[in-house]
Amino acid sequence: MMRQSVQTVLPESTGNNTLSLRDSVCRDLFQLFSSPHSPLPILLVSGMPEWQGHNQSDKLLQSWYCRQLRSALLFHEPRIAALQVNLKAVYCHELVISLDMMLYHDDEPLTFDLVWQKGSWHRTMPQ
């Protein structure tokens, strides 16, 4: 009887599962914002005209934007257990969003900042 052996390479468990989860969530969130085919509502990912002129200081509009963005992100990213969306800076052509979140299976908070500048989104390093 001939035996065949199948060699399998399993990923190493180095204790970095939490780190890879955090990196994966940040990467996927950035893709939600920067993809031209994003499932997020267009106003949430490229609604910069709303912030131009007199609307940039409209607290009611800012609050609405944060609530809508929070709802959309929680719907599209099931690994987020809790999420708070804050606007750090609102200028005519720049918007800085801070996403403070807790992930399932992760005991440490994660902050992820996104910056709208020169017509596209940029990310800052997560904390």
Curated annotation (Swiss-Prot):
NCBIfam families: PRK14128.1-1, PRK14128.1-3. It holds the Pfam family GPW_gp25. The keyword Membrane does not apply. Belongs to the GpW/Gp25 family. IraD subfamily. Disulfide bonds: none annotated. One of its GO terms (cellular component) is cytoplasm. It comes from Escherichia coli O127:H6 (strain E2348/69 / EPEC). GO terms for molecular function: anti-sigma factor antagonist activity. It comes from the Bacteria. Keywords: Cytoplasm, Stress response. It is found in: Cytoplasm. Interacts with RssB. Inhibits RpoS proteolysis by regulating RssB activity, thereby increasing the stability of the sigma stress factor RpoS during oxidative stress. Its effect on RpoS stability is due to its interaction with RssB, which probably blocks the interaction of RssB with RpoS, and the consequent delivery of the RssB-RpoS complex to the ClpXP protein degradation pathway. The gene is iraD. This is Anti-adapter protein IraD. InterPro entries: Anti-adapt_IraD, IraD/Gp25-like. GO terms for biological process: cellular response to oxidative stress; DNA damage response. The keyword Repressor does not apply.
